UniProtKB/Swiss-Prot annotation:
Induction: Expression is increased in clinical azole-resistant isolates and by the presence of itraconazole. Expression is down-regulated by tetrandrine and posaconazole in a synergistic manner. Expression is also induced upon amphotericin B treatment. It holds the Pfam family MFS_1. The chain crosses the membrane at residues 50-70, 91-111, 119-139, 149-169, 180-200, 211-231, 241-261, 272-292, 340-360, 375-395, 410-430, 448-468. It comes from Aspergillus fumigatus (strain ATCC MYA-4609 / CBS 101355 / FGSC A1100 / Af293). This is Major facilitator superfamily multidrug transporter mdr3. The gene is mdr3. Major facilitator superfamily transporter that confers resistance to azoles such as itraconazole. It is found in: Cell membrane.
Amino acid sequence: MLAMAASAEETNRQSNAGRRSVISPSEAPPEAEQSDVYQAPPPGLKEWLFILILCSTQLFVQGAFGYILIPLHIVGQTFGQGPSEATRMTWHVGGYSLTVGTFILIAGKLGDLYGSKRILVLGWAWFGVWSVIGGCSAFTHSPVFFDTARALQGIGPALLLPNALAIAGRTYPPGKKKNMIFSAFAVAAPLGCFTAGVVGSVFAQYVWWPWVMWTYSIGCFIIAAVGLWVIPSDYPRCQKAATLQFDYIGSVLGVAGLLLLNISWNQAPIDGWSTPYVYVLLIGGFLVLGLFELQERRAPGIRSWINFAMCLLWIQQCSSRQGPSQGILPALATPYLMAVITSGWLMAIACAAFLGGCILQSTAPVEQSYWMNTFWSFVIMAWGMDISFPASTTILSDAVPVKHQGASASLVNTVINYSIAIGLGIAGTVEAEVSHQGVNQLRGYRAALWSSVGLAALAFGIALVFAVCTFQEQRSSRKSSQEREQRACIEGCILGLTLTPDREWERVELGRLLSHVSQTGGLRSQSV
């Protein structure tokens, strides 16, 4: 009995040690471990503003993608680009997604080390400044200047996304409220892209397209100012020790490798793979990423979100239509799905949605109504996006300590935004080669869409294997846990009976039962 009491006391001590508390930053000592402490959310109305600011990051980031993508042909006319130069116009969108997906890799870690609030406010200010400059590039009539401004504009969202998720992850412990906030963050993605596409199209059609960039820049500056007031301060930390923890070599290798690889894929449709610098950049990118792999030992898969970027661009160019905000419903449903379905099967369902939507797009007849294959493909693929994003961010956020929330958010956002950027390059390459540089555009569009089907099928296969393996591991883990509990219960009973010599027959029976458990691997219902 003494041993049982000691074991129970040790279990309680470990449980209390692992429990994470929620306190305000002012109450936390400077040496407090962030892995053990959650920040207290702002009180009252400020908490609603706090959540709104965090969700606005996704709204504005995807908005900056949509307000150029939808009126892309009008934007191209400003720089003297017609329909025959569609492959060159992909840089107006791809340059932005390139830096978003690349610099996210290090932005989350910077927030972990120097304060997510500081990096978030800096990101809003950077986003606003380069939105103004991007709009002013229309006066230069230089597509190179505009693409450069768009690429630099993308650094702002790269700073915003992981640090917004990190702040939410440090503020709300695992639970229903956290799941709802992360799902609201996901809702902002389709809503932001759709509304910005509408607003951008209206400005481009009736006013002038740079005005949408200038309008959004005003919003960036306002949110930065409100964020300084609403967002709680980060915990104090030793800046020197934090600097020593930053992996400068891995950061440089990761960013450089992703940049080289993406530039080569997006330039290939323009100049062709036979151009020496294109394949030199590709080879160099793979070599640098190989060095990064040796440095970091981390290589996430990015196939699913690639095919959505392919479909969205080529459907927009081919049919001149935009998808409505079908992504809101699945994002709101995800918290409830996460409560009843394991993460592995959720990811398999998401990849199946990507695959089904891509197949519908690839097989759509030319003169078919928008409300047939095209509409339903958007509806189905929305479930893929809005299940995979909140599920993966919530799973990673719950799995890592509070002090590493920024790094985990960077991982998910790097996968999404970089895949969008490189997906445009892959689709452009396939389209240019199959259509013979625009001779047969429909054939090229079909080929680009079917390539997305192949990538989605590969992603679904990997997700299905992961789901089955995860299910087997969980079942084995539950069985082992039950066996340990049964054995501990019997051993405790035997130990208690040793203190009462007059109950020898019960001790003998329990000993036989314990031997049976050891031989068969578990208790039978009859024995119980």
